[in-house]
């Protein structure tokens, strides 16, 4: 799906474990490329009427709001998505159309909101078209949870990344949810710990295709600063 409209949704679900409603409800104003982090603080309402062009109010997340690091491995995807948004806006306006600037990171080409049910159905069609074994979009979230836990063993931090309660992450991973088993060092999960877990997972996903250092270097830094200033 690299280079298609599905690239970023799959990255957010498969690399970060975001829910579909959180993905299509993520606003560009909650992404800070200069600080290399983004906030999952709202989600798309469950039932968006067909033909909706503007969203004035989002729904709260299912759990506590969370701030997640943008790893070096994930940054190129974020930059490409911002470039895609800019191109779509320019093409829409050049063609005489109206661009609905909802400041959504994942939206239709004219900026209007995606609907959760249509996204799920379209993902199913994509999987069939690619002749891949059947999976639901939500299965990408479970895959992220399982892989992060297997690679790091950090039960509590994985739960914080996913926006799960201890009971929820335990059920998802199929392990004990005895609160007494959670040591005091995990009670306050800081951004640095989330960074460590996510970086371990993301490096394992693409050990030979990481765009860092000399390959991306100063160009990535310049783009990040430029995008950050555009969002302010």
Predicted regions span which residues?
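Extracytoplasmic/periplasmic beta-strand context in beta-sandwich domains
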Residues: 36-38, 66-68, 102-104, 184
């Amino acid at each position: 799906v690299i280079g298609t409209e599905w690239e970023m949704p799959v990255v957010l679900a498969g690399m970060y474990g975001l829910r579909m409603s959180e993905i299509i409800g993520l606003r560009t104003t909650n992404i800070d490329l200069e600080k290399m982090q983004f906030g999952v603080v709202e989600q798309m309402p469950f039932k968006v009427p067909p033909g909706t062009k503007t969203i004035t109010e989002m729904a709260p997340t299912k759990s506590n709001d969370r701030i997640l690091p943008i790893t070096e491995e994930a940054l190129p995807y974020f930059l490409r998505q911002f470039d895609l948004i800019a191109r779509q806006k320019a093409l829409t306006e050049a063609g005489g159309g109206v661009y609905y600037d909802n400041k959504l990171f994942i939206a239709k080409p004219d900026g209007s909101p995606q609907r959760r049910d249509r996204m799920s159905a379209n993902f199913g069609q994509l999987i069939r078209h690619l002749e891949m074994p059947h999976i639901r979009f939500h299965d990408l979230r479970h895959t992220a949870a399982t892989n992060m836990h297997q690679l790091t063993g950090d039960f509590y931090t994985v739960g914080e990344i996913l926006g799960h309660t201890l009971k929820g992450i335990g059920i998802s991973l199929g392990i004990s949810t005895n609160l007494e088993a959670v040591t005091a060092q995990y009670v306050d999960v800081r951004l640095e710990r989330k960074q460590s877990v996510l970086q371990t997972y993301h490096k394992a996903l693409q050990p030979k295709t990481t765009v860092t250092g000399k390959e991306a270097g100063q160009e990535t830094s310049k783009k990040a600063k430029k995008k950050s200033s555009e969002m302010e």
